[in-house]
Structures are given as C-alpha cells and as structure tokens.
C-alpha cells in the first residue's frame, strides 16, 4: 500500500511540476523581454508630417546636475508644400495646456527653417518644458510621454505672423548623453 501512495505522489509532482516549471519560464521570459513597454513613437495628430524615421531621442546631459530633458527629432514634411518652421517645443503638458514658447524669447528654440515637400530637418537640443513653462527634470532610463509641438507657416502664407501649430505624441526612453 505504501508503494502506491509514493507512486501517486511522484506522478502528481512530475505532472504538475512540469506545468509549474513551464509557468515560471514563461513569466521569466516576459520579464526579460518586457513586451508591455510602449514602443518608441512620434506620431502627429494630423496628416502631412512625420517624425518617427528615426524615432526621437530624449536625453539628459551627464554634465547637467539638474537632469534637464532635451529632445532630438527628425521632422519630415509631407504636407504638399514648403513650410517654414518658426518655433519648436518638447512638453509633457496635456494637449490643451501647451505652453506658448513664442511669448518667451528664452524658450525660442529653432530659427526659421525651410522644409520643402518630401524633405526633412533634424531638430537637435530641443529643451522640454512642463505645462507651467518650467524645465522638465528627469533621469536616464525613465519613460517620457509627451508632445513635440511645432509652430510653422506655409511658404506662401499671406501673413507670416499667423502661424499654424502641429503636435506629435512622443513616447521614448530617456538616455544619457556625454
């Protein structure tokens, strides 16, 4: 009788032990591969512009003790006509609360840059601000979810002081530079 109980116990352990081992291996693979992390994207809310080829880079400078956040992005014009970029902003503010950098010359980022249809420009060192206009401070390996906001004119606009605004949703991991 005792042999049968031992055999039943061994069969139980062998059957369910393999199942438990398989579950542990699947959980370990999920933790290692992290499929739940959002991909790095840059997606404009309206057609005519792209910025995900290559994905934007968000970084902090090693020499910057405060950990101020900066962005590099490549802006492609597919709007069908030449545009002139006036101002650029990186922010984590909700869409309706985007700070207006045009009112503060200290936050002016990009001079007038012409982009013809099908061409691109690289925006480098774009500082990131929160909804109050304060610099965003972060650290390496954090995930950034925010917006790239661009004020621009079409080359043939009647009044260049009236600017168009486009916003791109950006998700990226923060790296360290320098």
Label the model's feature ranges.
Residues 1-8:
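N-terminal leader/signal peptides at the extreme start of proteins
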Residues 31-178:
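N-terminal export/assembly leader peptides and their processing motifs that target proteins to secretory
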Residues 18-31:
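Hydrophobic membrane-insertion alpha-helices, especially the h-region
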């Amino acid at each position: 009788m005792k042999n049968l109980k031992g055999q039943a116990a061994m069969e139980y352990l062998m059957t369910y032990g393999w199942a438990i081992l398989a579950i542990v291996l699947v959980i370990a693979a999920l933790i290692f591969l992290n499929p739940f992390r959002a991909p790095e994207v840059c997606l404009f809310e309206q057609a005519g512009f792209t910025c995900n080829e290559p994905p934007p880079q968000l970084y902090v400078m090693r020499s910057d003790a405060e950990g101020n956040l900066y962005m590099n992005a490549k802006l492609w014009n597919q709007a069908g006509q030449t545009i002139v970029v006036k101002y650029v902003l990186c922010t984590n503010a909700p869409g309706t609360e985007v700070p207006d950098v045009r009112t503060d010359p200290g936050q002016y980022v990009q001079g007038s840059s012409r982009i013809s249809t099908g061409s691109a420009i690289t925006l480098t060192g774009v500082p990131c601000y929160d909804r109050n206009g304060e610099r965003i401070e972060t650290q390496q390996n954090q995930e950034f979810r925010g917006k790239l906001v661009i004020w621009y004119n079409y080359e043939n606009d009647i009044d260049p002081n009236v600017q168009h605004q486009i916003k791109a949703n950006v998700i990226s991991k923060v790296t360290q530079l320098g």
